[in-house]
């Protein structure tokens, strides 16, 4: 049986391309030859099944009044149940949690990620086969690239997520990667 890897994230996991001229297909989403999840699948080979679960705007625990259904927390159990069995759960979120409207900081975002990790561990379908969890700090927002929902504090917040997530991974006995 193949080993199953579920990748849950935001636009980075979805493959959003904000400049269609950068995409091979000139579309708003990178194609299967460009998305990191597809590249991971290709690198791992046929013994693995990499499942994409990316949504632009997705947050760890915040409801966004301007975007429907982007809060992962209320749907996490359903996603995990629908994709089980899993060998590895990859969570790469936090960028959208740094939006100015949420008035947050790196520690609060890490607490949101911790809630997700603990919820993921509590899903009854695992039994004794709980998947490993990899917490990935997303690439920080670049300085000077400020979208309407982000400001300089958002840039600094996303830069500090790697440190917070590394501590969290140790506390939760998970793994960590700084993208």
Model-based region annotation:
Residues 54-57, 135-137:
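A general secondary-structure junction signal
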Residues 2, 46, 70-179:
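Alpha-helical cap/lid subdomain in secreted, periplasmic
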Residues 1-55, 61-65, 78-83, 89:
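Serine-esterase "nucleophile elbow" of acetyl-processing enzymes
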Residues 13-14, 57, 97, 141:
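Active-site micro-motifs of SAM-dependent methyltransferase domains
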